[in-house]
Amino acid sequence: MIRTLLLSALVAGALSCGYPTYEVQHDVSRVVGGQEASPNSWPWQVSLQYLSSGKWHHTCGGSLVANNWVLTAAHCISNSRTYRVLLGRHSLSTSESGSLAVQVSKLVVHEKWNAQKLSNGNDIALVKLASPVALTSKIQTACLPPAGTILPNNYPCYVTGWGRLQTNGATPDVLQQGRLLVVDYATCSSASWWGSSVKTNMVCAGGDGVTSSCNGDSGGPLNCQASNGQWQVHGIVSFGSTLGCNYPRKPSVFTRVSNYIDWINSVIAKN
């Protein structure tokens, strides 16, 4: 019981998490379109990379939720691949001071995830690092919201990642961020938006035809600031429209983290 309570504090609300040392640059317009985040202002953001032909390649984002666990999307994970995690990094091509590359020892995909039925949800996975990392000004853990939290319509959040700058476009070398407004479930699940593809275990944000996540942002965080100034990861980038990354009334869809707090704590406690 004590161990469970300690884990809950660590991944769901410890005061040491969610307060970046380096200030977040507010009101940056878009990930699609290529607006650079302030270096190390999202210190829980990681790059999940796979090995191919002797080289490492960025495939997805993720969030450090404990000193040896990363939260990402289930669709990012393949058991046939070898992965590593880059932490404390702004530029993917530069060996920056204070950054780390850590091997992966375990992959845990949600047991109800079905790659053939993305709209069912449960697009969530945990990646265990081969060794714990020391927390610094450039590498910090994310805070997760209280279980069951539902953000109101038009709540401002930021999506971050190294995904494409536009539909079928180039990928950036440095971390991008984009401000998105939450779209409530009633709106997002309406016929002219996402319809039945969206479930209550998801969060929608964006849909204005300008700002969105894109390919390569998958698994990364939807960062939303609480009234006390603490940043919390409310979403995991899951899917977008095949019509384009920033298609009107097709907001970015995220796994709703607050629906999975018990699952996250359970996986970490058992592993």
From Swiss-Prot:
<feature type="disulfide bond">
    <location>
        <begin position="188"/>
        <end position="204"/>
    </location>
</feature>
<keyword id="KW-1015">Disulfide bond</keyword>
<feature type="active site" description="Charge relay system">
    <location>
        <position position="218"/>
    </location>
</feature>
<dbReference type="GO" id="GO:0005576">
    <property type="term" value="C:extracellular region"/>
</dbReference>
<feature type="disulfide bond">
    <location>
        <begin position="157"/>
        <end position="224"/>
    </location>
</feature>
<comment type="similarity">
    <text>Belongs to the peptidase S1 family. Elastase subfamily.</text>
</comment>
<feature type="signal peptide">
    <location>
        <begin position="1"/>
        <end position="16"/>
    </location>
</feature>
<keyword id="KW-0964">Secreted</keyword>
<feature type="domain" description="Peptidase S1">
    <location>
        <begin position="31"/>
        <end position="269"/>
    </location>
</feature>
<feature type="disulfide bond">
    <location>
        <begin position="60"/>
        <end position="76"/>
    </location>
</feature>
<keyword id="KW-0378">Hydrolase</keyword>
<dbReference type="GO" id="GO:0036457">
    <property type="term" value="C:keratohyalin granule"/>
</dbReference>
<feature type="disulfide bond">
    <location>
        <begin position="214"/>
        <end position="245"/>
    </location>
</feature>
<dbReference type="GO" id="GO:0004175">
    <property type="term" value="F:endopeptidase activity"/>
</dbReference>
<dbReference type="InterPro" id="IPR001254">
    <property type="entry name" value="Trypsin_dom"/>
</dbReference>
<feature type="active site" description="Charge relay system">
    <location>
        <position position="75"/>
    </location>
</feature>
<keyword id="KW-0720">Serine protease</keyword>
<feature type="active site" description="Charge relay system">
    <location>
        <position position="123"/>
    </location>
</feature>
<dbReference type="GO" id="GO:0004252">
    <property type="term" value="F:serine-type endopeptidase activity"/>
</dbReference>
<feature type="propeptide" description="Activation peptide">
    <location>
        <begin position="17"/>
        <end position="30"/>
    </location>
</feature>
<dbReference type="GO" id="GO:0090330">
    <property type="term" value="P:regulation of platelet aggregation"/>
</dbReference>
<dbReference type="InterPro" id="IPR009003">
    <property type="entry name" value="Peptidase_S1_PA"/>
</dbReference>
<dbReference type="InterPro" id="IPR033116">
    <property type="entry name" value="TRYPSIN_SER"/>
</dbReference>
<dbReference type="InterPro" id="IPR001314">
    <property type="entry name" value="Peptidase_S1A"/>
</dbReference>
<dbReference type="InterPro" id="IPR043504">
    <property type="entry name" value="Peptidase_S1_PA_chymotrypsin"/>
</dbReference>
<dbReference type="GO" id="GO:1901143">
    <property type="term" value="P:insulin catabolic process"/>
</dbReference>
<keyword id="KW-0732">Signal</keyword>
<dbReference type="GO" id="GO:0032868">
    <property type="term" value="P:response to insulin"/>
</dbReference>
<dbReference type="InterPro" id="IPR050850">
    <property type="entry name" value="Peptidase_S1_Elastase_sf"/>
</dbReference>
<comment type="function">
    <text>Elastase that enhances insulin signaling and might have a physiologic role in cellular glucose metabolism. Circulates in plasma and reduces platelet hyperactivation, triggers both insulin secretion and degradation, and increases insulin sensitivity.</text>
</comment>
<dbReference type="Pfam" id="PF00089">
    <property type="entry name" value="Trypsin"/>
</dbReference>
<keyword id="KW-0865">Zymogen</keyword>
<dbReference type="GO" id="GO:0050796">
    <property type="term" value="P:regulation of insulin secretion"/>
</dbReference>
<dbReference type="GO" id="GO:0017171">
    <property type="term" value="F:serine hydrolase activity"/>
</dbReference>
<comment type="subunit">
    <text>Interacts with CPA1. Interacts with SERPINA1.</text>
</comment>
<protein>
    <recommendedName>
        <fullName>Chymotrypsin-like elastase family member 2A</fullName>
        <ecNumber>3.4.21.71</ecNumber>
    </recommendedName>
</protein>
<dbReference type="InterPro" id="IPR018114">
    <property type="entry name" value="TRYPSIN_HIS"/>
</dbReference>
<keyword id="KW-0645">Protease</keyword>
<dbReference type="GO" id="GO:0006508">
    <property type="term" value="P:proteolysis"/>
</dbReference>
<dbReference type="GO" id="GO:0005615">
    <property type="term" value="C:extracellular space"/>
</dbReference>
